[in-house]
Design a protein with these regions (language model features):
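Short boundary motifs at domain starts and secondary-structure transition points
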Residues: 1-4, 56-58
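Acidic, PIN/NYN-like endoribonuclease modules and their adjacent C-terminal/linker elements
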Residues: 2-11, 24-33, 125, 136-187
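PIN/NYN-family metal-dependent endoribonuclease catalytic core
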Residues: 12, 20-84
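Alpha-helix capping/helix-boundary segments
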Residues: 16, 72, 134-135, 153-154
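Short, flexible loop segments at the rims of nucleotide/cofactor-binding pockets, characterized by
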Residues: 42-45, 122-128
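Short, aromatic/basic amphipathic alpha-helical patches
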Residues: 82-95, 156-164
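Acidic catalytic patch
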Residues: 93-126
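Acidic donor-binding loop at a coil-to-helix junction in glycosyltransferase catalytic cores
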Residues: 131
C-alpha cells in the first residue's frame, strides 16, 4: 500500500464513539486503565482501545477525517445519556469543520457513493441489521474509506462489504495495522 492509498476518512459507529468517550482519558491524555476495568475481559478489548489511542494521535495532526451522521446521532439519542450526546455533538462539530475545509462542499463527496449505497437495498446484504445498514449507507454516502467498529460480528463480512461497497469495515486494531507503518509521515 502506498501513502496515497491510506484510508483517511473514517466513519465511527456508535460502539467506537462510546469507547472513545469511555476511555477518553487513556486515548487522548495517556491516562491509566485500571486492572479491574471490564475492557481486560473482552477478547482484544485492550488492544482495540490501544489502537484507537494510536489512531487518534495520528488524527490530531489533521491527517484523518472522523465522520458521523444523523443516524449516528439518533443511536446516541436512543441511549438517553446526556454526556454521551454531548460527546457525539463534539465529534460531529469536528466532522463539520472537516467539511468546511472544502471550498466547494460538494467536492468532499462523489456521485459514486449514491450508486454504491443503492446496492444496500439488495437481498445480498440481509445479514446486516437495520441499524448497521443505515450506518453503512451513511458511511458510503459520506465517501468514507473505513467503517470503524468495536463489534466483532460486522467485520466478519468485511470482504463482501469492501468488494460491493468499496468500504473497509474493521476494528481499530485492523485499521491501525494499515495506518501504523505510515503514522510518522502523516504527522
Amino acid at each position: 500500500m502506498s501513502l496515497g492509498q491510506i484510508p483517511g476518512r473514517v466513519f465511527l459507529d456508535s460502539s467506537t464513539l462510546q469507547t472513545l468517550q469511555n476511555y477518553g482519558e487513556f486515548i487522548y491524555d495517556g491516562g491509566e486503565i485500571t486492572q479491574d476495568d471490564r475492557i481486560w475481559s473482552i477478547p482484544d478489548g485492550f488492544q482495540n482501545v490501544g489502537a484507537l489511542r494510536e489512531i487518534m494521535l495520528v488524527g490530531r495532526r489533521g491527517s484523518l477525517q472522523v465522520a458521523l451522521s444523523h443516524n449516528s446521532l439518533q443511536e446516541v439519542l436512543d441511549r438517553g445519556r446526556c454526556d454521551y450526546l454531548q460527546w457525539a455533538l463534539e465529534m460531529l462539530d469536528y466532522w463539520d469543520s472537516c467539511l468546511a475545509s472544502y471550498e466547494d462542499g460538494g467536492s468532499a463527496f462523489s456521485e459514486q457513493g449514491v450508486a454504491l449505497a443503492a446496492k444496500l437495498t439488495k437481498y445480498q446484504f440481509g445479514y446486516l441489521s437495520e441499524k448497521d445498514a443505515r450506518l453503512i449507507r451513511d458511511a458510503v454516502l459520506l465517501k468514507c474509506d473505513v467503517f470503524l467498529t468495536m463489534e466483532k460480528r460486522l467485520p466478519k463480512n468485511a470482504a463482501h462489504l469492501e468488494r460491493e461497497l468499496k468500504i473497509k469495515v474493521m476494528q481499530p486494531v485492523g485499521y491501525w495495522d494499515l495506518l501504523g507503518p505510515w503514522a510518522a509521515l502523516l504527522a
